[in-house]
């Protein structure tokens, strides 16, 4: 006959078997299950150990600023000051993330987003892309000119986060450590300092919408894009650890800077002398101040979310010829490899490289215009070569670039 439970008996921990008199506390659960304070403490320790291992796995292996610059040098020519500034900023950003994962400090480290200023084709986008590649984190590019306030025709700011999610294969944890580059940020400057009856839906309104993203918020992201599928389930993404890099040419801000410096040159003293020297700087953007950006049309709150401002210089002919030949994935190396697949050598004469660089400068396209220039020069060659088996080498001359003459062809020697 089965024993009938005796409720007057002393209860025991269901895990270690100790009685109530042997421990400080026993907690009762459903179905006559009990756990003592000692087993609770033991379980807590096991869980904490596992969480520590998980947190350690989340800590990024972080290259030093020197290592970041050295790797950037493999891909980016020139812009030494910008590379150094970005390397330090990115290192500190991900060091901050690692600290948040496994805290050791009493101080809360805040995020510092980055603004890049420089002419078209100076390498702003490419620098941001290269940083993401070096750090092996998800990367997305957004165009500020397509963004509008919620409720207006255009893209919601949440779509920026969607692009990062897509780059991370919808791994939310990976996306939350990614880098977003917002291009043409100068195009969302306020149209005027005067209040207008017509709403500036792609200017100040977008700046306001981006504010929370930049400082850190939990964004509700529609996985299929913004407004076409209103019933879709939203993905929650915390932007606190996403590094935002914004870039723009800021055409016209040089005039604002000169006006400010010019007003302060009048008079005597070291400040007046410094301002006079600044006015003669080849790149006046190096002297930009938050007040200049405010006058340009960015609201103070938005500028405050971009504490790091770095300036890229306009590329010279020397810079552009180096860009054509030196980086690991230089265009000349790419086209040489392409013709090599057809068993044909490719040579660019030095003055041809200078000529291509000059064309890019005249067109004000910078580095991004080099590929189209090469494509134009190489078009007929790349059309004909696959159909010929007698060509050993193609030589691109200065005349090929400037006058549109056909490249020189060296034919294979006919064996007797």
Curated annotation (Swiss-Prot):
Zn(2+) binds at residues 13, 16, 36, 39. Transmembrane segments: none annotated. One of its GO terms (molecular function) is unfolded protein binding. One of its GO terms (cellular component) is HslUV protease complex. ATP binds at residues 119-126. It holds the Pfam family zf-C4_ClpX. CDD domains: RecA-like_ClpX. One of its GO terms (biological process) is cell division. InterPro entries: AAA+_ATPase, ATP-dep_Clp_protease_ClpX, ATPase_AAA_core, Clp_ATPase_C, Clp_protease_ATP-bd_su_ClpX, ClpX_bact, P-loop_NTPase, Znf_CppX_C4. Residues 1-55 form the ClpX-type ZB domain. Belongs to the ClpX chaperone family. PANTHER family: ATP-DEPENDENT CLP PROTEASE ATP-BINDING SUBUNIT CLPX-LIKE, MITOCHONDRIAL (PTHR48102:SF7), ATP-DEPENDENT CLP PROTEASE ATP-BINDING SUBUNIT CLPX-LIKE, MITOCHONDRIAL-RELATED (PTHR48102). ATP-dependent specificity component of the Clp protease. It directs the protease to specific substrates. Can perform chaperone functions in the absence of ClpP. This is ATP-dependent Clp protease ATP-binding subunit ClpX. It comes from Leuconostoc mesenteroides subsp. mesenteroides (strain ATCC 8293 / DSM 20343 / BCRC 11652 / CCM 1803 / JCM 6124 / NCDO 523 / NBRC 100496 / NCIMB 8023 / NCTC 12954 / NRRL B-1118 / 37Y).
């Amino acid at each position: 006959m089965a024993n009938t439970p005796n409720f007057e008996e002393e209860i025991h921990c269901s895990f270690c078997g100790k009685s109530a008199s042997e421990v400080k506390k026993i907690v009762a659960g459903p179905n006559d299950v009990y756990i003592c304070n000692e087993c609770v403490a033991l379980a807590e320790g096991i869980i904490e150990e596992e969480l520590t291992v998980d947190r350690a796995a989340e800590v990024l292996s972080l290259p030093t600023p020197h290592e970041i610059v050295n790797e950037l040098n493999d891909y980016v020519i020139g812009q030494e000051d910008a590379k150094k500034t970005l390397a330090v900023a990115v290192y500190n950003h991900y060091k901050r993330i690692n600290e948040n994962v496994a805290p050791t400090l009493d101080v809360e480290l805040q995020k510092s987003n980055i603004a890049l200023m420089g002419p078209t084709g100076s390498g702003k986008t490419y620098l941001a892309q290269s940083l993401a590649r070096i750090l092996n984190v998800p990367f997305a590019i957004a165009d500020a000119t397509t963004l509008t306030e919620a409720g207006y025709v255009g893209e919601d700011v949440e779509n920026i986060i969607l692009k990062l999610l897509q780059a991370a294969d919808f791994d939310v944890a990976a996306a939350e450590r990614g880098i977003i580059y917002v291009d043409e940020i100068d195009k969302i400057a306020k149209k005027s300092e005067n209040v207008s009856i017509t709403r500036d839906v792609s200017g100040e309104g977008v700046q306001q919408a981006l504010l929370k993203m930049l400082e850190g918020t939990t964004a509700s992201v529609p996985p299929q894009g913004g407004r076409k599928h209103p019933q879709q389930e939203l993905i929650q993404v915390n932007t606190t650890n996403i590094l935002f890099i914004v870039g723009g040419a800021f055409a016209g801000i040089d005039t604002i800077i000169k006006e400010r410096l010019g007003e302060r040159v009048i008079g005597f003293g070291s400040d007046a002398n410094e301002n006079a020297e600044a006015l003669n700087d080849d790149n006046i953007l190096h002297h930009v101040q938050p007040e200049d950006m405010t006058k340009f049309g960015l609201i103070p709150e938005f500028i405050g979310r971009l504490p790091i401002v770095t300036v890229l210089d306009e590329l010279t002919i020397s810079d552009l010829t180096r860009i054509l030949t030196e980086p690991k994935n230089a265009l000349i190396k790419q086209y040489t490899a392409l013709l090599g697949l057809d068993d044909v050598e490719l040579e660019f004469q030095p003055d041809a490289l200078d000529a291509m660089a000059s064309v890019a400068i005249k067109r004000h396209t910078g580095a991004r215009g080099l590929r189209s220039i090469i494509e134009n020069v190489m078009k007929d060659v790349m059309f004909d070569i696959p159909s010929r088996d007698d060509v050993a080498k193609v030589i691109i001359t200065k005349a090929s670039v400037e006058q549109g003459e056909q490249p020189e062809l060296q034919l294979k020697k006919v064996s007797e």
